[in-house]
Amino acid sequence: MFMMLKNKVAIVTGGTRGIGFAVVKKFIENGAAVSLWGSRQETVDQALEQLKELYPDAKISGKYPSLKDTAQVTAMINQVKEEFGAVDILVNNAGISQSTSFYNYQPEEFQKIVDLNVTAVFNCSQAAAKIMKEQGGGVILNTSSMVSIYGQPSGCGYPASKFAVNGLTKSLARELGCDNIRVNAVAPGITRTDMVAALPEAVIKPLIATIPLGRVGEPEDIANAFLFLASDMASYVTGEILSVDGAARS
């Protein structure tokens, strides 16, 4: 079996469920050692237990730093390098959404989204990039969203934060290219995560009607895009925001 990430070391934030967990599994299946990061020890331990059952020979670890704490992030990334010998791939997937209307938005709600969806991406990318530069290169991948391009009628903090991620992605691609560090983002459309699965059918059906492929995306669909961008098959791809949405907004 051809393994696209053989002998690579990856960090995946927000890796305990949904898209992040699918990315972790896809990377392991393709030969990578993976450190999955989550917000709580309990969820990290549960994810590790599942992975060890599925992939008993895999090289995996789990961590739960506060991603807005620069010192914690730097320490954890350095630990990953010590554990596995390198940091080749960083996937900034951790994030939160909010559906509050603009008129009712509280400043602390907006700041919370910025902290995790933007500041955390900056912190993790900066710490990882320093190691990647020393190694001679690496890959940074960010989770964006199609609403970063088209907006949404409520919860403006989420699309605003993902638009910021797009800008950071493109800027870092230009700045870090000389150090052989590629930076891209994946912008998923409606994907069958826990959040979407909880929506009533009356909400889901109209959404599916807007998708030419006639279905919502699966986490594995998004994970496949991350796998491609992380691999050497995308060695000349950087600064891109790859939409994976079934042509919902094309």
Curated annotation (Swiss-Prot):
Tell me which residues bind NADP(+).
N93, Y158, K162
* Entry's pH dependence statement: Transformation of DCA is more efficient at pH 10 than pH 7.
Q: Reaction(s) catalyzed by this protein?
A: lithocholate + NADP(+) = 3-oxo-5beta-cholan-24-oate + NADPH + H(+); deoxycholate + NADP(+) = 12alpha-hydroxy-3-oxo-5beta-cholan-24-oate + NADPH + H(+); deoxycholate + NAD(+) = 12alpha-hydroxy-3-oxo-5beta-cholan-24-oate + NADH + H(+); cholate + NADP(+) = 7alpha,12alpha-dihydroxy-3-oxo-5beta-cholan-24-oate + NADPH + H(+)
State any single GO MF term.
3-alpha-hydroxycholanate dehydrogenase activity
**What's the Enzyme Commission number for this chain?**
1.1.1.-, 1.1.1.392
Q: Give the record's keywords alphabetically.
A: Lipid metabolism, NADP, Oxidoreductase, Steroid metabolism
Which biological process annotations from GO are given for this protein? bile acid metabolic process; fatty acid biosynthetic process
What does the record give as the active site? Y158
InterPro entries, from UniProt? Answer: NAD(P)-bd_dom_sf, Sc_DH/Rdtase_CS, SDR_fam
PANTHER family assigned = 3-OXOACYL-[ACYL-CARRIER-PROTEIN] REDUCTASE (PTHR42760:SF133), SHORT-CHAIN DEHYDROGENASES/REDUCTASES FAMILY MEMBER (PTHR42760)
The entry sums up its family as follows: Belongs to the short-chain dehydrogenases/reductases (SDR) family.
Functional description taken from the UniProt entry = Involved in the modification of secondary bile acids into iso-bile acids (3beta-bile acids) via epimerization of the 3-OH group through a 3-oxo-intermediate. Catalyzes the oxidation of deoxycholate (DCA) and lithocholate (LCA) to yield 12-alpha-hydroxy-3-oxo-5-beta-cholan-24-oate (3-oxo-DCA) and 3-oxo-5-beta-cholan-24-oate (3-oxo-LCA), respectively. Is also able to catalyze the oxidation of cholate (CA) and chenodeoxycholate (CDCA) into 3-dehydrocholate (3-oxo-CA) and 7-alpha-hydroxy-3-oxo-5-beta-cholan-24-oate (3-oxo-CDCA), respectively. Can also catalyze the reverse reactions in vitro.
Protein name (record): 3alpha-hydroxysteroid dehydrogenase
Question: What organism is the protein native to?
Answer: Mediterraneibacter gnavus (strain ATCC 29149 / DSM 114966 / JCM 6515 / VPI C7-9)
- What gene makes this protein? baiA
